[in-house]
Amino acid sequence: MKGASEVRPMEAHRKLLKPLVERRRRERINNSLEKLRIFLSQALKSEKLKNPKVEKAEILECTVQFLQSSKLVPQDGDVGNKGYQSGFQHCLETALHFMNSKPDLNVATKDFLSHQLSSYKPPAEAWSPTDTPKPTPSIGYQDSAPHLSSNTISVSPTKTLVDGQFSPQTFQTWRPWV
């Protein structure tokens, strides 16, 4: 059991640390508010925010107003989404052109892929650059995937098109904890 003399230095140490921790917390808050004031004064071109002595409440109110008004204005992401879709469409067209330029590609495979690629139109609201699927690691697939011949096209994780015929395949699911 600890004696009373051992506990008191710990309490005294905590009492000394408490104001230091509080001072650091206030410094962080004030630094963040100052950065926010500068950002808002540049974004809103507000004269009252250019004054470094502006109240903290005023900075926070301007921030709320800025965020509310930015929700109402159409975002540049809508324009970016259209650019993404046109790029995606261009990529599909390039893939079709490349595939059709290969005379040695199996006719059934070429017809199937041409039909799939030409019929694909991404929904306008569903696709955006931030929604693109992330590539999955291929570590778990290296040993489990069968080697495909030159006239074989993998259509989905469970089906393969071989000379115009579907053949079922099974892949082991990659799990990072295994």
Swiss-Prot record:
GO cellular component, one term: nucleus
Gene: hes7.1
Residue span(s) of domain Orange: 84-116
Motif (WRPW motif): 174-177
This protein's UniProt keywords: Developmental protein, DNA-binding, Nucleus, Repressor, Transcription, Transcription regulation
Organism: Xenopus tropicalis
Compartmental location: Nucleus
Name of the protein: Transcription factor HES-7.1
Pfam families the UniProt entry points to: Hairy_orange, HLH
